[in-house]
């Protein structure tokens, strides 16, 4: 059985099509997933932070989520922030967001300053069958 970690690593590698690999601590990530849930889709955005305020804002509409998860109940949404370091993507922050009655809030990170000029935000949607 493929673990959630394996799925994430494979999806992100396939998405980027680069030499970068994803380093994720299994202990950090696994508690954010429901045991009966599964990942069905993810979205990725790159943010240029060079000479700009170090703040990251993610906005996801309910329509977009529903289009990604047709026929499934959304259990949880997980946001991962990756910082490029050499040929790796180091996970620097994450947030797990429960959806209640189809409500969805904006998630904002204060990233702090570093020498890299961009970060990537990966949005993972965990669902359970209806």
Residue spans for each PLM region:
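Tubulin/FtsZ superfamily GTPase core signature
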Residues: 1-130
């Amino acid at each position: 059985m493929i673990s959630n970690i394996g799925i994430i690593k494979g999806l992100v590698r396939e998405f980027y099509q680069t030499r970068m690999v994803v380093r994720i601590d299994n202990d950090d990530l696994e508690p954010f997933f429901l045991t009966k849930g599964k990942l069905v889709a993810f979205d990725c955005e790159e943010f240029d932070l060079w000479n700009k305020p170090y703040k990251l804002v993610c906005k996801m509409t309910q329509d977009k989520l529903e289009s990604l998860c047709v026929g499934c109940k959304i259990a949880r949404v997980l946001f991962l922030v990756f910082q490029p370091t050499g040929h790796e993507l180091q996970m620097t922050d994450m947030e797990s967001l429960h959806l209640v009655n189809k409500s969805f809030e904006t998630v904002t990170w204060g990233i702090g300053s570093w020498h890299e000029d961009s970060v990537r935000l990966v949005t993972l949607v965990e669902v359970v069958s209806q």
